[in-house]
Amino acid sequence: MANRNLEKLASIDAQLRLLVPGKVSEDDKLIEYDALLLDKFLDILQDLHGEDLKEAVQECYELSAEYEGKHDPKKLEELGSVLTSLDPGDSIVIAKAFSHMLNLANLAEEVQIAYRRRIKLKRGDFADEANATTESDIEETFKKLVLKLNKSPEEVFDALKNQTVDLVLTAHPTQSVRRSLLQKHGRIRNCLAQLYAKDITPDDKQELDEALHREIQAAFRTDEIRRTPPTPQDEMRAGMSYFHETIWKGVPKFLRRVDTALKNIGINERVPYNAPLIQFSSWMGGDRDGKHPRVTPEVTRDVCLLARMMASNMYFSQIEDLMFEMSMWRCNSELRVRAEELYRTARRDVKHYIEFWKQVPPTEPYRVILGDVRDKLYNTRERSRHLLAHGISDIPEEAVYTNVEQFLEPLELCYRSLCDCGDRVIADGSLLDFLRQVSTFGLSLVKLDIRQESDRHTDVLDAITQHLEIGSYREWSEEKRQEWLLAELSGKRPLFGSDLPKTEEVKDVLDTFNVLAELPSDCFGAYIISMATSPSDVLAVELLQRECHVKHPLRVVPLFEKLADLEAAPAAMARLFSIDWYRNRIDGKQEVMIGYSDSGKDAGRFSAAWQLYKAQEEIIKVAKEFGVKLVIFHGRGGTVGRGGGPTHLAILSQPPDTIHGSLRVTVQGEVIEQSFGEEHLCFRTLQRFCAATLEHGMNPPISPRPEWRELMDQMAVVATEEYRSIVFKEPRFVEYFRLATPELEYGRMNIGSRPSKRKPSGGIESLRAIPWIFAWTQTRFHLPVWLGFGAAFKHAIKKDSKNLQMLQEMYKTWPFFRVTIDLVEMVFAKGDPGIAALNDKLLVSEDLWPFGESLRANYEETKDYLLKIAGHRDLLEGDPYLKQRIRLRDSYITTLNVCQAYTLKRIRDPNYHVTLRPHISKEYAAEPSKPADELIHLNPTSEYAPGLEDTLILTMKGIAAGMQNTG
């Protein structure tokens, strides 16, 4: 297959180069990278499983490729016959092989993107901001602002110093690849990048070839399937591993690049080390969101202590290197006095240190100071470890750092002293990097947000009011709730004592507040209230924080998710800001979170995107009226259906005046790996967030014209009606959805700790947004993304033919509208209604077939309208790179789609019989064995026929890798 596949890839490449002459450059190496990895893998497959199995993989690939050429459904049935004739062990190996090939295609693509970026930088090209595959780096953005937009370098520097990007890592269950495999993928990526480096010697090449072979084989031999669901502590450790591996060193490296870029526009100052350019927060271990049974108060406590221990350990691991560097004897008098005092009071020898274990003499004053810092870091780490393991520690608080100011003070003293003595160049080396790390990560590494549903707070307050015999808080009107809450907040008496009767749920909420009171305040960020609808939801949390003695109360952030909540959000915030007590409490600063996932599930992507846009404008307007600086926290997922898309485009298409140098955004699931999995990815992520935030503030996008707004409002009404009439009102829809997609089987992937439903029973409403999008992504039908668009466009153009011209103008000149259309176009390029039709034929009862056909007709009509508005003849004609990447993976994904459909048929229909051919895989083993039995033994408790469950899960993971989205 290798040679034939190489020819096929080369022919696709040639077609793509002809498609848009001059657009896919001659130095593009994606095909070469892809073919190299595929060649290696197929050799490994033959070595491990024999020629016959490799031939079966080849046959499947070629049938898929033939289908991709003509979209003849008979080819899918032929492919289905081949796949269903395999015995259970062979079926697992083939599903695993195609899943593995898609992961390799992703790695080839990542290396190619990095390669193309380096070439562009060498040429000094400006990025094409309208293109979904490119983005400006920080230097390009500075130059663009100064040279093209006539901003002064000082204005740029001033805006930069005062901006903040807070990236919030969440444990949303969308990372379908195990950490064991992610690490191997990282090593494959590195080998591939080094193999194509210039000046590589023959010996280096040979060793890299061997390493590449080893890592590809190791990845293939690793079980892709998580056999048990992760706990919140597992998720937190997985999230924290990115800090250890890339983010920790990536931040100072990125800030140095910012310094260099500033120099290149004439600013001879560095970004101050305490400028809050980048911050990190987390939801891992803090995200309850209603009934998440595994996130308990104890888990929250453990996660905070673990993060604290990790932070002090990472500082501790660097401090001796810094002591080696700080060998200077000249210092200012302030530092000398401190060093002599420490020398007199310090212990003599410290034998548990590797370096500088003997007492440092006062002639090396910086080392004396840093030695004391080292002692305190050691104690800080050990105290966190004791508290984590035993709940108590004999290390007193005086011997540790309890807040970041204590930690920064001696480091700042060293920095000032070096500058005073003419050694600024030394101060601006590793010491500056260390100071920047301390300012960014503090003592807690990340700040943990707590998220809880508003109903859970209502339960607690209802228990309190019933116990006090003053009525039922739950049944009170909003006015009465506010009146009582404000009276209690203004008073000083405690509301309840230890005699308060507590259900398990009430105890859980109160114990969480007790953890907030117990741990250092710098462990925590925001307290987010999901399903927030009224001011009392916010005041309730303020009161509970006070009652549980939280010394430094967390800022309270309402989260508006559904369409009606987004529409009501500006009025709710105005009511909240009009309360004197609350305005005094917030000191002119407020954060509001908007949810992209649930709003999309509630009303469809078109209406959700437009309502999110309008809600931001309105909330900002309300905040300005009350003199409040508002930060909008964007709860975006990775997929387009959950608000995802290229970062720079997403930021630059936000309404003007809504970011103003403060951006807070979630980084979820698989997006964490795509953003921080490698050093260069981390660097690029920090650049794109900072650059786009700066550009949005200094060069805001245009506001839509009144006639555009009017048209959008009309279309949104039609889009919502169309979406809801099908998803919520059509009686056949729920049955069709459950039959046509693997939604019911989603939970078997074990990719997250939380349940896939908010309520155990219930329909689409109770299903979380992630499995909702995941299920449609698997069938390549993507219904939640496009449903409603076609009806909206059809209505607008039928009403007045001039509206087509207006929509085309909106696409050309309004970033928000262009990004919305481009992202849906990208999803159509990844879609294939032929796969959905196959699923219908195999899995859906015949009486529902006409319903499926009507949805597919809607899909095609929507696609046609989309192309008309974008002025494109074909999907992605303006983005050949993306088209190239999608085309390369289509044949792999199609095989997995067909395998999934037939596997689901075998699982769900006991009367569906297949004829199996003899086992074709050979396997090396110490003793003769049946490899099928070995593979099936990995899942001995499956309720299905042998091998079917693992085959199904492998197809899900492979399709997720191929679509580059799970949920």
Swiss-Prot record:
Alphabetized GO MF terms: phosphoenolpyruvate carboxylase activity
The EC number(s) this enzyme carries: 4.1.1.31
Reaction catalysed by this enzyme: oxaloacetate + phosphate = phosphoenolpyruvate + hydrogencarbonate
Which GO terms of the cellular component aspect does the record hold? apoplast; chloroplast; cytosol
**Residues recorded with modification Phosphoserine:** S11
Quote the Pfam families the UniProt record gives.
Answer: PEPcase (PF00311)
Q: What biological-process GO terms show up in the record? A: carbon fixation; leaf development; photosynthesis; tricarboxylic acid cycle
Q: Where is the protein found, in the record's own terms?
A: Cytoplasm
InterPro entries, per database record: PEP_COase (IPR021135), PEP_COase_bac/pln-type (IPR022805), PEP_COase_Lys_AS (IPR018129), PEPCASE_His_AS (IPR033129), Pyrv/PenolPyrv_kinase-like_dom (IPR015813)
Catalytic residue positions:
H172, K601
Q: Pathway involvement?
A: Photosynthesis; C3 acid pathway
May I ask which residue range the UniProt record assigns to the signal sequence?
none
Entry cofactors: Mg(2+)
* Origin: domain of life: Eukaryota
UniProt entry tagged with the keyword GTP-binding: no
Q: Keyword Zinc-finger, does the record have it?
A: no
Function comment: Through the carboxylation of phosphoenolpyruvate (PEP) it forms oxaloacetate, a four-carbon dicarboxylic acid source for the tricarboxylic acid cycle.
In terms of NCBIfam families, this protein maps to: PRK00009.1
Q: Which family does it belong to?
A: Belongs to the PEPCase type 1 family.
> Mind telling me what this protein is named?
Phosphoenolpyruvate carboxylase
**Which source organism does the UniProt entry give?**
Flaveria pringlei
Q: Which gene encodes it?
A: PPCA1
